Amino acid sequence: MSEKIVQLNEEIIKGQLKELVRGSVEETLNELLEKEAESLTQAARYERSEARQGYRSGHYDRNLTTTSGDVTLHVPRLKGMSFETAIIERYRRRESSVEEALIEMYLAGVSVRRVEDITEALWGSKVSPATISELNKKAYVHIEDWRNRPLQGGRYPYVYVDGIYLRRNWCGEYENVAVLVAIAVNEDGFREVLGAAEGMKEDKASWVSFFQWLRGRGLDGVKLIVGDKCMGMLEAVCEVFPDAKYQRCTVHFYRNVFSVVPKSKVKIVVKMLKAIHAQESKKASREKAKAVVAELRAMKLKEAAKKVEDGIEETLTYCDFPSEHWTRIRTNNVIERLNREIRRRTRVVGTFPDGNSALMLVCARLRHVADTQWGNKKYMNMKHLEAALDDASIAG
């Protein structure tokens, strides 16, 4: 009698084992998150205790890439205290840096040897350069999913926007096209990249489309939008977020004034302008601005005086918000630093073959910086804003 031979499908077994490990990792990490929350609050969920510190306020989901695969973390929300977990810091998402490397290889035209070396470092085995195109398609899908993800950070009181120009091929001709970028500080005080999208130029139509896209994905609770006074942006803010206030970036405002000031007088004008925004109230800043305008006219800098006189009010909106936040909401330096990092990477490419490749590289960099540099570092203490929301000047 012949014995039956059982054939095992190695790929199926590997897949099942991988899913078993992934599920175990996911379950363990979520249990650790709950333990961390219990330790911080000094009480279990639903437990009544005199020693309790803070209160539970549900959960929010966050995807995390581990060596065992993608897992979904159910991160506890706490009221009355911040929850800064070491779990996410330790197992921070690695996907973005991998995708960025793939896209850079594809766009920068790296050598075959470098492609082999990098792919071996990333996946443990050398990948033929012939497969790079397929790998990039996969990376594009992941980044596009991230770019269009629902915004789940609750409310976003402070939003920073800017445009970065990249050179790309457009119907056989090369021209500069704007990539519009937005980041925000959420209600818990953490920075978050909201998104990036290509706009033919920084005009009202592009900004309206961009803001509507963000709002459609869940951007809510906006109190202040910080940015440069580029064409059409202020009108777009009023149309899409009528209850939000607009803060013109003071750094961009200064540069605009410097454009009509002789180089020999820039240093003294810098001190004059900074003195306006060093005041302790909007009223004092307005009075200082009037004095600066008069002084500029006395220095025969009539154009500079007019720019200050016409534009100063838009730069003082930050005074309507908690003074503890002033230094971080009167400029969009937080997004400018991101843009410098993006330019450093895109400079290697030079001219992009199309808008999609440019946008994907920008998004990959944004995601990488947010994941690796921002992490769980709180950017602002939002209790100051919560305490001020009863003020009609902020509530709008």
Protein language model features and the residues they cover:
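Short, conserved DNA-binding cores of transcription-related domains
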Residues: 2-89, 167
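Acidic/histidine-rich catalytic cores and adjacent linkers
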Residues: 2-4, 24, 35-38, 42-43, ...
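RNase H-like nuclease fold core
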Residues: 74-79, 86-92, 125-126, 131-226, ...
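Metal-dependent DNA phosphodiester-chemistry modules and their immediately adjacent helices/loops
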Residues: 84, 257-291
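Short, amphipathic alpha-helical "recognition" segments used to contact nucleic acids or chromatin
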Residues: 97-109
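DNA-recognition alpha helix
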Residues: 113-124
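Conserved beta-strand -> loop -> alpha-helix junction used to position metal-binding or nucleic-acid-contacting
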Residues: 224-231, 236-272
